[in-house]
């Protein structure tokens, strides 16, 4: 029962009817990705930058709540700098059928990567994960080539994150999902960056700091006063993001 409650806390999807119409302030394309072998079907949004030759793609994995209507709005942070943007909803989120599971999220990440690789070389794919999405992003980066990996408000593992948040006797019961980000990071052979705020009440700064040895001092960016949901409201975030994207 406790693990079932933990799972409901970890995964907080908002479902959408099949006929829901997405609306954004820039051009986009909606489509579904389907894996015939497993039957997994996930909803995706693609935002083209609309200019420049040899464009690159930001393959974005969002956090644990909401759906594409919320997360698609972040596309402008990247398209304004000439980067195409692809974001997916995990199983059970938005229009994606099914229930969210750890393996289902990893499988979804692979499906999105397959779509990207048909249109971009791996050197032009940037994997980006935010919060829970840092697990999917780091898992994918540990298994597939890309230009670089960027994580925003990541955690070392779900087990460790729970230990930071609840009494020890509850944490010792374990987590219903693992999402071992620190384990995946050690296996990523290309550049990795982390953005973390000092006032994050969901992923404590100390928790994210555990990932620093696998990223390096020069790519671990601390946003003073930044929380869990507002890093893109800080000029320092945008300044460093542009630098990282252009490296």
Label each PLM-derived region with a short phrase.
Residues 115-118, 122-166:
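Primarily recognizes the serine-hydrolase "nucleophile elbow" in alpha/beta-hydrolase
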Residues 1-34:
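An N-terminal hydrophobic leader/cap segment in hydrolases
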Residues 235-247:
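Catalytic active-site module of serine/aspartate enzymes centered on a nucleophile-bearing elbow/loop
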Residues 201-207:
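Conserved alpha/beta-hydrolase "acid-adjacent" motif
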């Amino acid at each position: 029962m406790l693990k079932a409650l933990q799972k409901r806390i970890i995964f907080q999807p908002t479902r959408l009817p099949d006929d829901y119409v997405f609306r954004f302030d820039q051009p986009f394309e909606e489509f579904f990705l389907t894996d015939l072998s497993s039957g997994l079907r996930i909803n995706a949004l693609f935002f083209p930058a609309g200019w420049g030759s040899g464009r690159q793609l930001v393959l974005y994995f969002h956090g644990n709540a909401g759906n594409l209507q919320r997360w698609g709005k972040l596309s402008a942070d990247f398209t304004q700098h000439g980067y195409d943007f692809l974001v997916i909803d995990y199983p059970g989120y938005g229009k994606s059928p099914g229930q969210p599971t750890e393996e289902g999220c990893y499988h979804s990440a692979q499906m999105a990567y397959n779509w990207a690789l048909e249109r971009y070389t791996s050197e032009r794919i940037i994997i980006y994960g935010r919060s829970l999405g840092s697990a999917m992003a780091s898992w994918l980066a540990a298994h597939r080539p890309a230009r670089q990996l960027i994580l925003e408000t990541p955690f070392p593992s779900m087990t460790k994150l729970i230990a930071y948040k609840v009494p020890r006797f509850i944490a010792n019961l374990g987590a219903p999902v693992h999402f071992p980000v620190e384990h995946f990071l050690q296996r990523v052979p290309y550049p990795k960056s982390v953005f973390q705020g000092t006032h994050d009440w969901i992923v404590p700064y100390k928790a994210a700091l555990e990932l620093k040895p696998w990223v390096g001092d020069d790519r671990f960016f601390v946003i003073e006063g930044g929380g869990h949901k507002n890093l893109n409201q800080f000029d320092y975030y945008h300044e460093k993001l542009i630098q990282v994207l252009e490296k």
